[in-house]
Amino acid sequence: FPTETMEVGTVLFEQGGTDGDGFIVQVGKVVLSRKVCGSVQSGIFVGAGEILGVYKTLFENDARYFTGTVLEKSRIIPIPEQVLKDRIAASDPFIIYCVRNWPNFGDRLIG
C-alpha cells in the first residue's frame, strides 16, 4: 500500500463516521479524541509502528468511537476497509470469535 505524507491537523477519521479504513503510522504521531457530553477528551497517542482505525471494522461497529487527528507531520499507510474485511473473513473463525468476545475488551476501548 502506498505511504501518504499527512500534515498536522489532518483528520484521518471522525467519531461517528461509518468508514472503516485502518492506518499504519510509519513516522509521526496521531491523537485519538472523543466528544463526550459536549467536551472533547483526548490522550490516546499513536506513534510510529502502531496501527489505528481498525476497531470499527474488526468489531463490526456501526460507527467510529474516536476522531483520529495527525498531531505532527506523519507518514501513514492507509489500509482500505475492504482489505481489512477480506483479511478478517479469511482468518481462523476461532481467533475471530476470541478477539470479538474478549471479556469487556470493547468496553475498555470506548470507556
Residues covered by each model-derived region:
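A small-molecule sensor/coupling module
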Residues: 63-66, 82-111
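A short hydrophobic beta-strand segment most commonly corresponding to one strand
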Residues: 74-83
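Short proline/glycine- and basic residue-enriched helix-capping loop/turn segments at helix->loop/beta transitions
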Residues: 1-10
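Short, flexible helix/strand-to-coil boundary loops that buttress conserved ligand/catalytic motifs
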Residues: 34-36, 56, 80, 88-91
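Cyclic nucleotide-binding regulatory domains
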Residues: 10-72
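Glycine-rich, flexible loop/turn motifs
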Residues: 2, 39-42, 54, 84, ...
